Regions:
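Amphipathic, interaction-prone secondary-structure segments
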Residues: 2, 7-28
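N-terminal start-of-chain detector that recognizes signal peptides
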Residues: 1-5, 49-52
Length: 82
């Protein structure tokens, strides 16, 4: 499993990231509201579009690897299940 997050824009109110799962398409959008301190998937990527558990997993990785690391410009998360 692989996720790719890339910052699209940042303001004093929110940070917007493009993201994808298992591809480099960056076809989804995740928004983090700085005032409310919460993240949500604004537009799911193709792999998450019809699967609520996939969206929850992608959002968890966004929070753990992007938000907790002070919003890097680009972040790739890779998990190898054996």
């Amino acid at each position: 499993m692989r996720w790719l997050f890339e910052r699209k824009s940042e303001s004093t109110k929110r940070v917007i990231y493009r993201y994808s799962r298992d591809s480099n398409d960056l076809d989804g959008l995740v928004v983090y509201d700085k005032r409310m301190e919460e993240a949500f998937i604004y537009e799911p990527c193709v792999e998450d579009r019809y699967s609520y558990p996939n969206r929850k997993e992608s959002l968890a990785h966004f929070i753990n690897y992007v938000v907790e690391r002070s919003f890097p410009e680009r972040k790739k998360v890779v998990f190898v299940y054996r």
